[in-house]
Amino acid sequence: LTFRNVHNWMGGGYADQAFEEFYAALKPGGILCVVEHRLPETASQDPRGSTGYVQESYMKDMAKRAGFEFVASSEVNANPNDTADHPFGVWTLPPSSGLPEDGSEEAIDFEPELYKNIGESDRATLKFRKPL
């Protein structure tokens, strides 16, 4: 199980490597579950994952390239109130409710209370299997 890590791997340029290493570590029939902040399919995917959001199709493609089969998805971590379009990416929402670390002017008008009503991010929950 990996929880909210894919965007970090994308930012570091080693997302494909991570999926390949999971594949190598698992026995045939082994299961990999991925929970990640979900970017709507209609939005443009930054290959560096800079907003913290990743499209399901993008994650499925990475897993497939590594050799995994897609098994199922779940909406257990879904949040339909999250548009994934926030000034500081996923870090705009709780629990971070963050401001930019650089102290930019944009932070002056930021009102974290507006984002608390959204709640935490919408998350994809995906299950993959290493073929037998």
Named regions from a protein language model:
Residues 1, 23, 46, 79-96:
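Flexible, surface-exposed loop/gating regions in the mature catalytic domains
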Residues 15-28:
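A short glycine-rich, Lys/Arg-flanked "PGG" loop and its adjoining helix->strand segment in the class I
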Residues 84-132:
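Core SAM-dependent methyltransferase catalytic element
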Residues 29-38:
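Conserved beta-strand signature within the Rossmann-like core of class I S-adenosyl-L-methionine
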